[in-house]
Amino acid sequence: MKIIVVEDEIRIREGIRDLIDMMEGEWEFAGEAENGEAGLELIRSIHPDVVITDIRMAKMDGLEMLEAAREEGIDVKAVVLSAYSEFEYARTAMKMGVTEYLLKPVSIDEFFKALEHIRTQIEKEKQQQPDMLGSLEQ
């Protein structure tokens, strides 16, 4: 599964990339961007399974980026990282279907659990797709 990271702080991007590289299995670090505009371009070109994004960034914030991708019909799971515990951010993220909302600093354990949760969701959705196609054919 392909993951991209959209984060304005280079040290955080590098740290996340290193964590993904450490993980064994089907996770592949597929790219990174430093703001929402560049992140949206990356989403369009790579079509990742998962986007890990900050909220507040220059040019376009993470939630705007995810909303723009969804409006274009790009279905992607998202992990939102935020230094802000304001409820409004979390509520907006939940309304958009964000899979995980993690507060910085994120522990390694939290990060791995979030990705495992997403992996499980993706697998369940893939198993349900043939069932849905079969019911449409009847």
Report the location of each language-model feature.
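Receiver (REC) domain active-site loop signature in two-component systems and cognate sites
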Residues: 57
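Interdomain helical linkers/hinges and coiled-coil/dimerization scaffolds
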Residues: 94, 98-100, 106-138
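Active-site residues of response regulator receiver
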Residues: 7, 54
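Two-component signal transduction core modules
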Residues: 51, 78, 93, 101-102
